Curated annotation (Swiss-Prot):
<feature type="binding site">
    <location>
        <position position="136"/>
    </location>
    <ligand>
        <name>(S)-2,3,4,5-tetrahydrodipicolinate</name>
    </ligand>
</feature>
<protein>
    <recommendedName>
        <fullName>4-hydroxy-tetrahydrodipicolinate reductase</fullName>
        <ecNumber>1.17.1.8</ecNumber>
    </recommendedName>
</protein>
<dbReference type="GO" id="GO:0051287">
    <property type="term" value="F:NAD binding"/>
</dbReference>
<feature type="binding site">
    <location>
        <position position="34"/>
    </location>
    <ligand>
        <name>NADP(+)</name>
    </ligand>
</feature>
<feature type="binding site">
    <location>
        <begin position="76"/>
        <end position="78"/>
    </location>
    <ligand>
        <name>NAD(+)</name>
    </ligand>
</feature>
<dbReference type="GO" id="GO:0005829">
    <property type="term" value="C:cytosol"/>
</dbReference>
<keyword id="KW-0521">NADP</keyword>
<dbReference type="GO" id="GO:0009089">
    <property type="term" value="P:lysine biosynthetic process via diaminopimelate"/>
</dbReference>
<dbReference type="Pfam" id="PF01113">
    <property type="entry name" value="DapB_N"/>
</dbReference>
<keyword id="KW-0520">NAD</keyword>
<keyword id="KW-0028">Amino-acid biosynthesis</keyword>
<comment type="function">
    <text>Catalyzes the conversion of 4-hydroxy-tetrahydrodipicolinate (HTPA) to tetrahydrodipicolinate.</text>
</comment>
<feature type="binding site">
    <location>
        <begin position="7"/>
        <end position="12"/>
    </location>
    <ligand>
        <name>NAD(+)</name>
    </ligand>
</feature>
<feature type="active site" description="Proton donor">
    <location>
        <position position="139"/>
    </location>
</feature>
<dbReference type="InterPro" id="IPR036291">
    <property type="entry name" value="NAD(P)-bd_dom_sf"/>
</dbReference>
<keyword id="KW-0457">Lysine biosynthesis</keyword>
<keyword id="KW-0220">Diaminopimelate biosynthesis</keyword>
Length: 246
């Protein structure tokens, strides 16, 4: 399987390139960066699967090109909140090929998300909810894709279990607030925290990344799944790279 990386000159693109070059199961194909030698069309044409580690500002262009020449995609880029156009293009592409959407490819982040949804169903609205994330000073996204995903699963769980609407930055009788905080400092690879806080206690779910290699390894798990399972076209999440159901 020939793998092409979109955003190949960035931090994660460079790391994944090194890891792919050290394996025998995959072939590192031509990658794309804005200052690179290959056009986006040629990168799509000359690879069997694409991994997107670029930026949310490039997603529209990439997905439009893929709709003209569909190839399986691991979409590991932050997806803006309420990005209807991007969502629509991802769903259209998934009609033709497998599309795995995972803004965070680490195993721990996936488990944290599932546990956060569980706790949102357990604790009622006497528990306030806070989501906080910290990344290195060079990260461009004002809010990480992982934090957006955490907010989304918390809102969904509250709606389904308690029939209560939650949102970021809103607090009225009908809509409860989720506090969302982001910091860009130092060289932090990634830290996400979900806290449920009442007048009498709090419980905190915290996931900390010590090495960005965990994201590259998670991407390899998903690539392994694509080879081993030969999945039909469809819209998939990061759970496809896990060996067990969580």
């Amino acid at each position: 399987m020939r793998v092409g990386i979109v955003g190949c000159s960035g931090r994660m693109g460079t790391l994944l390139s090194v890891l792919l070059s050290s394996t025998t199961r995959f072939t590192l194909g031509p990658g794309y960066s804005r200052k690179g030698a290959h056009s986006l069309a040629s990168v799509i044409e000359n690879n069997d699967v694409l991994v997107d580690f670029s930026s949310s500002s490039f997603s529209e262009e990439l997905l439009s090109a893929l709709l003209s020449n569909p190839k399986p995609l691991i979409f590991a880029t932050t997806k803006p909140i309420a990005s209807c156009s991007i969502d629509e293009k991802l769903e259209r592409l998934a009609v033709h090929v497998p599309v795995v959407v995972c803004p965070n490819t680490s195993l721990g982040a996936y488990v944290q998300k599932r546990l956060a949804a569980l706790l949102a169903r357990v604790f009622d609205d006497t528990y306030d909810i806070r989501v906080a994330e910290v990344h290195h000073r060079h990260k461009r996204d004002p809010i990480s894709g992982t934090a957006n995903e955490l907010v989304s699963v918390l809102c969904d769980a509250k709606q389904k279990e308690w029939n209560q609407e939650y949102s970021v930055g809103t607090n009225c009788n009908n809509v409860k607030n989720i506090e969302l905080h982001a910091s860009r400092v130092g060289n932090v690879s990634g830290e996400h925290e979900v806290a449920f806080i009442s007048d009498k206690e709090q419980i905190v779910l915290k996931h900390t990344v010590f090495s960005r290699e965990v994201f590259a390894e998670g991407t390899l798990r998903i690539l392994d799944w694509l080879i081993d399972s030969s999945p039909p076209p469809g819209y998939y999440g990061p759970e496809v790279g896990l060996k067990v159901s969580v």
